[in-house]
Amino acid sequence: MSISQAPRAIASKNIDLIGYNDLKERPAFKIAMQEVNGRFYLYLSHFWVSGWSVIDVTEPDKPEYLNFIEGPDNTWTLQVQVAEGILITSLEKIPPGWGTRPDDPPEAEGIYIWDVSTDPATPKLLSHWETGSDGTHRNFYNGGKYAHLSACCPGYDGQIYRILDVSDPSSPKEVSKFALPEQKQGGKEELEEGLRIFQHGPAHAENGRAYLPYARGGMVVVNIEDINNPTIVSRLNVYPPLGSAIAVHTVYPYFSKGFAIANSEALKEKCDEPLNYTAIIDISDETNPRLKSLFPVPEPPKGYTHKNFCERGGRFGPHNQHHAQGLDCLEQKEDRIYLTYFNAGLRIYDISDPNLPREIAYYIPSDPTKRLGLLPETLVTQSEDVLVDRRGYIYVTDKNHGLHILKCSI
C-alpha cells in the first residue's frame, strides 16, 4: 500500500506520516521487534483474529507484509515479546464482550515459544507452556534465561507473577511465583467480587527487581535477586481516587533517573469511570515510592469536532508506553515518553524535568471508515500500542486501522 492510500491525520504536531500497511484488514494490537542482518522485523498480534503477523519495516515507507501465523481457535493471542531470536506469544481465555465464545474454553492457554533466529519471517514453534488455568496476558522477555509472565494460576484470583526458566526454550520450567495476599482463594484477605486485583503485566525485570503493574492493587516492587524466592519491597496504591479497574496498567522504571513512569488504562467509553492518568513516581527510595508529578491531559486541537476528547466517543485516556526493554533495535531515550491515548492518538512527552512533564508532539489518525471489530461502540480512532526503533521510526496500531509508521520531527 502506498502512503497516498494511508488514512490521513485529523491533526498532528511535530510528527510526520512515513508509511502505512492495512495488514490485510487484520486489526493490530501489540508490537515487538527484532533486527536480523540489518533488517527490521515487526511481530504483531491482532484483535478479533487469532494469530500473528510478520512485517519487514527495513524500508519504513514501504512496509512489507511477510507472513501470517494462524493461532488457536477461540483464544486471545494479544501479547508478543521477542529477543535473542526467541518469540514468546501469549495465549489467553477471551473475556466477555469481545464477540467470541466466552463460555467455551480456549483452544490453548499459556504461552507459545518460537524460534525466529534463522528465519525471522517463519517462526518455528519450539514449545507450549500451560498455566493450568486461563492463560497469560502481558509478559516480559528481553533475552537471557528468564521470562516474566502475567499468568493465571490455580488457587489464585486473577493473574499473578510467574517466572519461567527458558534457557532451554523447547522445555520451559517454572522457577517461582509471586502473588499478593488478596489473591489467594479462600484466604483471610480474599477480596469480594468486583474489588479483586490482578497482575496486569508486564513485569519490568531489571537490576534484581521486578516492577509490577497490579491494576487496583497498585505499583508493586518485588525483590528477585533470589529468583527462586521473590519477596515484596513496597507497594504504592493510586486507586482510589485515580484510575479505572486497571488503575496501574504499566510501570516502566528508569533507574538512572530515580523514577518510574506509570499509567492506568482507560476502559469505559466517554470517560465513564474515575480519572485516568500518567504519572512520574519517585523510586529513589524503593521502600517508599511516592507520586512526583502528573502528565497534562491532552487537549483537542483548534477546530476539532468536540470541545474535549471524552465527548468524542470511544475510549479516551492512556494505554501503552513505548517499552525499550534494553533492546538494541529500539530507541533508548530517557527524556521522552511515547504514549498511545486511544481517541487522542499518539502523544509524545518531554520528561527532562520530571517535576513538569510537557507534551511536545501528537498524531491523531483519521477515524476508520470500515468496522473490523465490535469495538469501540462509536467508530473512532483508538490508538493502541506504540514502539520506536533505534532509527526513530514510530509504529502505532489501532483497533480498526492498520499499522501507522511515523517520525517525530523534533
Show where each model-derived region lies:
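Feature marking well-ordered beta-strand scaffolds used for ligand recognition
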Residues: M1-I410
